[in-house]
Amino acid sequence: MTAAETGRGKPRLGGGSGLGGSPAAVVWLHVGATGRDAVSPREPVVAAQAAGRPLKLPRRLLRQPTPGLRGAESGPTVDMPVPSSFNDIGQGWRLRHFVSWLWYEREVTLLERWIQDLCTRVVLRIGSAHFYAIVWVNGVDTVEHEGGYLPFEADISSLFQVEPLPSHLCITIAINNTLTPQPCHQGPSVHDRHLQVGTILPPLHAPTFPPHPVVFLPGTGYPKGYFVQNTDFDFFSYAGLLWSLLLYTTPPTYIDDVTVTTGVKRDSGEGFW
């Protein structure tokens, strides 16, 4: 039985650090249809599978509410604790080296007062999603975030405080762990229309740290968007939901941010704020 099938029940939310307070958020991981098979960082290009990471996930995949993606359409699924690194928690080589889109999904039970009190502001906070994430709540595109090291959040009150009032909330997160040459990513890229099949390119002059090449092969012998990622750093690229997910509430008037201004008195060296 897949995680998608077992996840259809109503989970009980207990104490812990996972989504909604559960010790381990039950998720389903989609590792086939939305990406490529994993290839070794040192495997020759000629043996690599087609790889491509669109900057925006094709919306045709989610024209219907996300529960419709379960079952036959979801592909292979596994239970995954949150927070954790999906590619470091198992023992399989394929999962450990997977690079592309993966899917998390969890259904949670809403507190009745959250639904009925229109003055309650409900926020979904994601501590870390490495590296590029798109979040849906009840099938609605809610928030996107790029950069896997900082938290982000979204006010989701309007998504369920409407008639008919739902009793459950379906949270779906698509994460892509490809490290691309964008400014906030790590590593340069190489574009060459004349590369020979089987070529592995060395790192460039490393404008960012850590250095590694993302090699795009746009020649006629490759599918559109084909690339090979060769990691040359000496640590593992942990990916997935690396920190906890939280649902919390605030009143309509709330503190959004705090700025502390400090200074030093020149005559005494005394600090103040």
From Swiss-Prot:
Region of interest: Disordered: 1-20
One GO BP annotation of this record: carbohydrate metabolic process
GO MF annotation, one: hydrolase activity, hydrolyzing O-glycosyl compounds
InterPro entries (UniProt xref): Galactose-bd-like_sf, Glyco_hydro_2_N
Gene3D superfamilies: Galactose-binding domain-like
Family according to the record: Belongs to the glycosyl hydrolase 2 family.
PANTHER family xref list: BETA-GLUCURONIDASE (PTHR10066:SF67)
Descriptive protein name: Putative inactive beta-glucuronidase protein GUSBP11
Species whose genome carries this gene: Homo sapiens
